[in-house]
């Protein structure tokens, strides 16, 4: 297990991590916050060099169900061509209360079809085969945000196979500022720029740019409306 944190963290968390007596744990510390994509790439370089076949990641405040890894590895064994595997997830608020049950398509074909409009994977639920990283490369450092979206695009271009386990194996936490961070002109512009680039990479055509424009436009709406759209547009 590799744990990385950038910049400063609370003394309580630092003390907890430092006190872990588990030889499987590797703590990576960095004084400067260089962003999620750089941190993920640093860890990918480490685990790829170590020769691991499967690579999983999650954020500190999310929760994996106890059988998550068992079910995903079993799915890999039953579907040897799959290289990027996610799951369904239950979105929870800061207090742990359920907000939304998020489903994703199971098959590769349906994943690629959905990707014309929006992401087809829930990032922290994903486990990669090492072959995925070997084919697609590391996370892009050239995006304002959406490093996961670009990672999926790189995988599709490289011919990688995607799938999702149709089970709720993960709880994804939404903090109080979740929608506030995902709206505004800068975010809307970044969304359209990213999705337009993805559409060109995958030759999705003009209709996909229409969806990108609609997606970006939603980011300019009031938070109360964005909350409603966030739920209804994904059904």
Residue ranges and their predicted role:
Residues 1-184:
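Nucleotide-sugar donor-binding/catalytic module of glycosyltransferases
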Residues 178-235:
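Non-catalytic, C-terminal membrane-associated alpha-helical segments of glycosyltransferases
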């Amino acid at each position: 297990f590799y744990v990385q944190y950038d910049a400063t963290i609370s003394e309580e968390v630092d003390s907890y991590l430092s006190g872990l007596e588990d030889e499987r744990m590797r703590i990576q510390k960095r004084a400067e916050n260089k962003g999620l994509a750089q941190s993920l790439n640093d860890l990918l370089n480490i685990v790829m060099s170590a020769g691991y076949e499967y690579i999983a990641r999650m954020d500190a405040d999310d929760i994996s169900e106890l059988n998550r890894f068992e079910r995903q590895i079993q799915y890999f064994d039953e579907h040897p061509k799959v290289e990027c595997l996610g799951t369904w997830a239950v979105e929870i608020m800061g207090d742990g209360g359920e907000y939304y049950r998020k489903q994703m398509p199971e098959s590769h074909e349906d994943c690629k079809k959905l990707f014309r409009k929006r992401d087809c994977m829930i990032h922290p639920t994903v486990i990669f085969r090492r072959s995925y990283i070997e084919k697609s490369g590391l996370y892009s450092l050239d995006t304002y945000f959406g490093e996961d979206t670009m990672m999926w695009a790189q995988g599709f271009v490289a011919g990688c196979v995607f799938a999702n386990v149709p089970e709720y194996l993960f709880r994804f936490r939404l903090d109080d500022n979740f929608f506030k961070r995902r709206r505004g002109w800068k975010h809307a512009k970044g969304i359209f720029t990213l999705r337009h680039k993805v559409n060109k990479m995958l030759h999705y055509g003009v209709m996909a740019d229409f969806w990108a424009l609609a997606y970006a436009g939603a980011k300019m709406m009031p938070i109360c409306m964005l909350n409603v759209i966030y739920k209804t547009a994904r059904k």
